[in-house]
Amino acid sequence: MLDVKLLRNNFDEVKQKLQNRGEDLGEFEKFGELDKRRRTLIVETEALKSQRNEVSQEIAKLKREKQDADAKIEEMRVVGDRIKTLDIELREIDEKLDMILMSIPNIPHESTPVGESEDDNVEIRKWGEVRAFDFEPKAHWDLGTDLDILDFENAAKVTGSRFVFYKKLGARLERALINFMMDLHSNEHGYEEMLPPYMVNRASMTGTGQLPKFEEDAFLIEAEDYFLIPTAEVPVTNYHREDILKAEDLPRKYTAFSACFRSEAGSAGRDTRGLIRQHQFNKVELVQFVKPEDSYVALEKLTGNAEEVLRRLELPYRVLSMCTADLGFTAAKKYDLEVWIPSYNSYREISSCSNFESFQARRANIRFRREPGSKPEYVHTLNGSGLALGRTVAAILENYQDADGSVRIPKVLQGYMGGIEKIELPK
C-alpha cells in the first residue's frame, strides 16, 4: 500500500510512474476525486462543529438570562443533522479510498527500466556456459518418466492436471535440494530457518498483496476462510504483522521451505507438460526486514544468495532487471533469475528477488523504532526464491543428462544423496 501523503502531495508524479507500469488509471483518478471531496467535507464539518459550539454557548447564555432560546436550539438541530449527514458520507468515502488504495500497485524505483512488455526486461549478467549436446537431449518430463522418478500420469489420476508424484531417486533428489538450499542459506548466508504454516487467513494474504486483487489465483478453503499459501513469503512476512521491531534487531533474515499452491488462473495452455507450472510445488524462500536506507544494498545481496545456489549446482543462468510493465503488483524493483532449460532452448524463470520498500509493511503494519520512544517507521521488506524446487529439478535433469538416458547428480548434491553420482535407467 502506498503512503496516502505521497499520493496527495505528488499526484502527477505517481500517476506518471503508474502509467509507466501500463496501469489502467481509472481507480487512481477516482482516488484523486474522492480525496478532494473528502478534504472539502472535512473543512465543512469542522466549520459546522465550530458553529455548533458557538451556538451551544449562546443557548446557555440565553437560558441563564431567562430569554427565549428556541430559535438557536432549532439552528443547532439543523447544524447537528448536517454534521451527521457529512460524517456518514465521510465514512463511506474513507471505505472507498481504503479499497482503492489496496488496488493501486507499488510505484517503480527510479532504477527500474521503463518498458511496455517482458521484451523490455534488461539482462544484467550471465553465468555459466550453455551445454552443446552431441546427441538429441530429452525434455525433463520424458527423462523423469523413463528413469521412473517422476509420475505425471498417476498424479493426474489421483488429483488432476499440473500435479506430479516424485518417486525413488526423484523424491530423494528433491529432498537433497531442499536440505542443500536450507543449509546454504542458514549456515553461510545468515538466514534464520523457519517451517511455516501452509494455510493463512485473509489478513495475511492482504498484508503481502495477494488480496484483494488476486484472489482468483489462490486456493481458498471456504469452510475456514483460509488460503493455501502461494509462497512462504506470505506466512513469513506476516510473522511480524502489527509488530514494532527494534532498530538493533534489523535486518531480520528468514529462510523457509514450504509447499506452494497456485491456481494458475490465466495460464491455460501454457507449460502444460512437466514441472515448470504446477498447482503444487516446493520452494525455498528468502525474506528480509531491513531499514529503509539499507534495502537496495540488501536486494543485491539477496539476489546474490539465490544466484549462489545455481552457481554451486553449476547450472547456467542469467539475471534480468524487470521493466515497469513486468514488475508485479507489490515490487518497486525486481530481478528475475532464469536458468537454462534445453528442451525450451531458452532461459526460464527460477527465482524472483524483489524489494517492496514499505509497500507490504504499510499493509501489514510492520514498523521499527530507531531509538526507544521514537516514532515508529515502516520497515522495508524483501523476498526472493532460493530456489523453486520443481524448476531446479527440471534444470538438473535436462542439463546433466547423458546420451544413454542417465542423469548425473551435481557434485554439491552427492553428499546429500548418500554418495549417489548418477540416476540410471531401470534394468
UniProtKB/Swiss-Prot annotation:
GO terms for biological process: selenocysteine biosynthetic process; seryl-tRNA aminoacylation. L-serine binds at residues 231-233, 285, 385. Its EC number is 6.1.1.11. One of its GO terms (cellular component) is cytoplasm. The keyword Glycosyltransferase does not apply. Pfam families: Seryl_tRNA_N (PF02403), tRNA-synt_2b (PF00587). CDD domains: SerRS_core. Pathway: Aminoacyl-tRNA biosynthesis; selenocysteinyl-tRNA(Sec) biosynthesis; L-seryl-tRNA(Sec) from L-serine and tRNA(Sec): step 1/1. Signal peptide: none annotated. Its main location: cytoplasm. It catalyses: tRNA(Ser) + L-serine + ATP = L-seryl-tRNA(Ser) + AMP + diphosphate + H(+); tRNA(Sec) + L-serine + ATP = L-seryl-tRNA(Sec) + AMP + diphosphate + H(+). One of its GO terms (molecular function) is transferase activity. It is found in: Cytoplasm. The keyword Protein biosynthesis applies. ATP binds at residues 262-264, 349-352. Homodimer. The tRNA molecule binds across the dimer. Catalyzes the attachment of serine to tRNA(Ser). Is also able to aminoacylate tRNA(Sec) with serine, to form the misacylated tRNA L-seryl-tRNA(Sec), which will be further converted into selenocysteinyl-tRNA(Sec). Consists of two distinct domains, a catalytic core and a N-terminal extension that is involved in tRNA binding. This is Serine--tRNA ligase. It comes from Listeria monocytogenes serovar 1/2a (strain ATCC BAA-679 / EGD-e). The lineage of its organism: Bacteria, Bacillati, Bacillota, Bacilli, Bacillales.
